[in-house]
Amino acid sequence: STLAAQMKDPQDWVGYEEIMGVKNGLRFYDFDVNLIESSAPANVFWPEDDIRLKFQLINNTSQSIDIDAKVHIFRYGTKGIPNDIWLPQMIKLDYEKVIPVHLSISPNGYVNTSVSVDDIKDFGGYAVVFDLGKYGRRLGTSFVYSMKPSLVKMQYPKQSLDYLGVDFLNRVGVQSIRYGIPFVSTNSSDYQGFRQELKRLMKDFMDNNITVMLMFGEGRMAQSMPLGTTRPHLDENGKFLHTKQDLVWLPELDEDFKKFVKELCLDFGWPKGPVTAVCLWNEPWEGTSISGWQADMIRYKEIYTKMAEAVIEAREEGIDVLVGGGDSNSNALDKFFADGTMDMLPIFDFLSIHYQGMESPVLYPEWNNRKHYKGRVKIWDTESWVGNTDDRIGLVIAVNRSAGYDRSMGIFGGYMYSGDPNRSVRNIEIRTEKGKEKVLKLHNTWSTAAAMGAAQSMIGEREFNKLLFKNGLPW
């Protein structure tokens, strides 16, 4: 993973203010706009869908707003900036429609207005901007017009994302996710509640043909640590460093962790449920990790082995789940094979990698000739957020597949959708005739979501065949 500051919110993209015609970060806006209804889940429209949107405008002033306003609907896109994977440039494209609308809003009052569009033919991202003249311009929403995917149930889809909500994943045709969960002790008072919530979520995944790689993390174990606190590294004087902390639980909890993993595999493992693989920790680097790993490779091997034992026991009861991880081939060699033996190979079904590009470990004879469960070690990209623009994501996916990846990711979800359940506001307050009411927030979907939909339709589950331009691109 990377520091949150590296990922850029849409309002920080190059050209956002100019293309949208809005001003970011003002202390006061005369009016606000909220999308309160959309005729497509996650604001992703397919060719057969009617495009209908309903907005609520709120007057933030003590004066009436009575104006002939304009609703601008226009197509835009994003493109990459050389040597920068995190900062997109927004560009305006060839469609724009202006809808006149008269708005009359009482002081500190509100009004609802609907917008319908029936002449969009090109795939991509579309912005809806309200222009109220002297009262300013505000973004109403961003939606995408995307290719409709052909979804079928499968165990190992070739494209994956992090969890962005079932609606969004379904609409862009992505059927596999990395899903991080904490280790919750089976003896804790909230374990059954945790299981029930997970059961609801896993059913949602299963019903929508979305497979899951569970990534077990640090859990809720601070109270079990010495002095009941997590542990950062020390400097040469024995003082705590202001850095990441060690969140690894103590060895006496390993058997409970094994029980935890086994119960989840039995409950939610394939084919009974959507879980097709498990791994341990996000980027568990040696020394320190953004995700709180500061134990040594011996400790990792101990915990990983318990996770693998749980999976093997679940397999004996008909569950088909892979076990793997590492997040880079060099880290996997450290964690699993540093003793010079292949003793861990039978419980190393897949390697997860992050940000390795063409440096794909597909030529290791020991991994390719593996005869244990499901054969050779699979190569899964479970992060690599590098193709974060319309013009890059398809190329990144194609390049990764050509490098021998069995699964690609290639993009951070926030560049496609602002509704990540773990990073976004769930509810908003709207005005009604009966007073204020909380409703689910409808989030903006950005142009790169349409590029992902196109990649899924045009690349999808196809096997890599050959490089067309073996001596480099012809231009």
Predicted features and spans:
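Sec-exported extracytoplasmic/periplasmic mature domains
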Residues: 170, 182, 206-210, 266-270, ...
